[in-house]
């Protein structure tokens, strides 16, 4: 006798910011005996190996933005081709529900599911709803949010909004209860610097110049771990080697980033939704530099959720100078109580069972519309 087990199609853009929470949901669904397939774009190759999907469907995708009408028209044509691919995949997989985590690669499969009357659930990770999710929200049965307050949700969809939190990766949950590292006069100062899943050149430009400005006694205690883009790596390492730091490790990518976050006294980073949620989960203070230039300013809104409770400093990139960063580092490292208080404040914003909450929502939505 064949036992039917439902399948959920999870859709996410191919970068860590979208894939990490999608991955966390996938693990939670599989723990309930629900099969998972993933629809995404070609960028997924570098991080797809850890995704617990029985099938990965690559969908043609593009972002219809910019001033060039030709480029925008080309993007629309690409999305149209992706819609055809997605519609065939949805018919073949016959999912009980389709869950979208944002980014334009989610538009073709989510729209295909809505037109084929398959229940859809949106998850918005940021404190400002993205344009792709805003477009899809009208046809979704449920809109789950990572933050309690989210700007930009279409008015007609607000009644279907449920705050679940952002799903946290198992590797983060594994270190979430790590106590804040002891910090006293003369002890090592552990600073972690990273720029998100794709790195950030500004960190390689500003942070070394700021470290040079620190008093020598602080530099001697500083143990620095920094993510640097491959093209910046050698120059960044060489600058640090001349500073007399207590320790330095730089690399383009750290697979064990959650463990390094748990070991840090302070984190300097961008403020993507996953980063902000993981800082809260582990309880680590941060200096956050929101990605500039975004029309919706979503990273600034994300950073504000921690800054408003005293868990982080949010510095616009235009004000993120070596002098400003050096001054903030001296202020925090010379007053350890500020760091421990910020660490405790960060934990007040965490939702460790967000993946289970979202999995329950997905299962209930699929059952209610089957």
UniProtKB/Swiss-Prot annotation:
Where does this one sit in the cell? Cell inner membrane
Pathway assigned in UniProt = Cell wall biogenesis; peptidoglycan biosynthesis
Record's keyword terms, sorted: Cell cycle, Cell division, Cell inner membrane, Cell membrane, Cell shape, Cell wall biogenesis/degradation, Glycosyltransferase, Membrane, Peptidoglycan synthesis, Transferase
Write down a Pfam family by its short name: Glyco_tran_28_C
Q: Which reaction does it catalyse?
A: di-trans,octa-cis-undecaprenyl diphospho-N-acetyl-alpha-D-muramoyl-L-alanyl-D-glutamyl-meso-2,6-diaminopimeloyl-D-alanyl-D-alanine + UDP-N-acetyl-alpha-D-glucosamine = di-trans,octa-cis-undecaprenyl diphospho-[N-acetyl-alpha-D-glucosaminyl-(1->4)]-N-acetyl-alpha-D-muramoyl-L-alanyl-D-glutamyl-meso-2,6-diaminopimeloyl-D-alanyl-D-alanine + UDP + H(+)
Which molecular function terms from Gene Ontology are attached? UDP-N-acetyl-D-glucosamine:N-acetylmuramoyl-L-alanyl-D-glutamyl-meso-2,6-diaminopimelyl-D-alanyl-D-alanine-diphosphoundecaprenol 4-beta-N-acetylglucosaminlytransferase activity; undecaprenyldiphospho-muramoylpentapeptide beta-N-acetylglucosaminyltransferase activity
Role according to the record? Cell wall formation. Catalyzes the transfer of a GlcNAc subunit on undecaprenyl-pyrophosphoryl-MurNAc-pentapeptide (lipid intermediate I) to form undecaprenyl-pyrophosphoryl-MurNAc-(pentapeptide)GlcNAc (lipid intermediate II).
Query: Main localisation, per the record?
Result: membrane
Query: Which positions in this protein are listed as binding UDP-N-acetyl-alpha-D-glucosamine?
Result: 15-17, 126, 169, 197, 299
Task: Kindly give the CDD domains that the UniProt entry links to this protein.
Answer: GT28_MurG
* Superkingdom, natural source: Bacteria
Query: What is the name of the protein in this document?
Result: UDP-N-acetylglucosamine--N-acetylmuramyl-(pentapeptide) pyrophosphoryl-undecaprenol N-acetylglucosamine transferase
Q: Which GO terms describe its cellular component?
A: plasma membrane
User: Which GO biological-process labels does this protein carry?
Assistant: carbohydrate metabolic process; cell division; cell wall organization; lipid glycosylation; peptidoglycan biosynthetic process; regulation of cell shape
Q: Belongs to which family? A: Belongs to the glycosyltransferase 28 family. MurG subfamily.
Q: Does the keyword Glycosyltransferase apply?
A: yes
Query: Cross-referenced NCBIfam families, in alphabetical order?
Result: murG
HAMAP family the record matches: MurG
Q: Which SUPFAM superfamilies match?
A: UDP-Glycosyltransferase/glycogen phosphorylase
């Amino acid at each position: 006798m064949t036992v039917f087990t439902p399948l959920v199609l999870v859709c996410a853009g191919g970068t860590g910011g979208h894939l990490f929470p999608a991955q966390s949901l996938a693990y939670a669904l599989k723990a309930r005996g629900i099969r998972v397939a993933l629809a995404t774009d070609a960028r997924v190759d570098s991080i797809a190996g850890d995704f617990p999907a029985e099938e990965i469907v690559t969908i043609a995708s593009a972002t219809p933005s910019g001033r060039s009408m030709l480029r925008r028209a080309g993007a629309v044509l690409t999305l149209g081709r992706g819609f055809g691919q997605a519609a065939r995949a949805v018919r073949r997989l016959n999912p009980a529900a389709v869950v979208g985590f944002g980014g334009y690669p989610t538009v073709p499969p989510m729209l295909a599911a809505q037109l084929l009357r398959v229940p859809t659930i949106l998850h918005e990770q940021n404190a400002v709803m993205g344009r792709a999710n805003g477009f899809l929200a009208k046809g979704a049965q449920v809109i789950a949010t990572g933050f309690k307050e989210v700007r930009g949700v279409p008015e007609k969809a607000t009644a279907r909004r449920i705050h679940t939190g952002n799903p946290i990766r198992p590797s983060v949950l594994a270190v979430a209860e790590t106590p804040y590292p002891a910090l006293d006069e003369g002890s090592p100062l552990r600073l972690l610097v990273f720029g998100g899943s794709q790195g950030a050149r500004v960190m390689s430009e500003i942070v070394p110049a700021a470290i040079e400005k620190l008093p020598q006694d602080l530099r001697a205690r500083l143990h620095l771990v920094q993510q640097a883009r491959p093209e910046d790596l050698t120059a960044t390492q060489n600058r640090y080697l001349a500073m007399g730091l207590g320790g330095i490790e730089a690399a383009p990518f750290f697979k064990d980033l959650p463990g390094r976050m748990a070991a840090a006294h302070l984190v300097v980073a961008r403020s993507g939704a996953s980063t902000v949620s993981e800082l809260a989960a582990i309880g680590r203070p941060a200096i956050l530099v929101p990605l500039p230039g975004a029309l919706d300013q979503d990273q600034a809104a994300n950073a504000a959720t921690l800054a408003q409770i005293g868990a982080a400093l949010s510095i616009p990139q235009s004000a993120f100078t070596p002098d400003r960063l050096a001054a903030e580092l001296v202020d925090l490292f010379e007053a350890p109580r500020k760091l421990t208080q910020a660490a405790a404040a960060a934990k007040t914003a965490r939702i460790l069972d967000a993946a289970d909450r979202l999995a329950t929502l997905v299962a209930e939505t699929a059952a209610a519309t089957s």
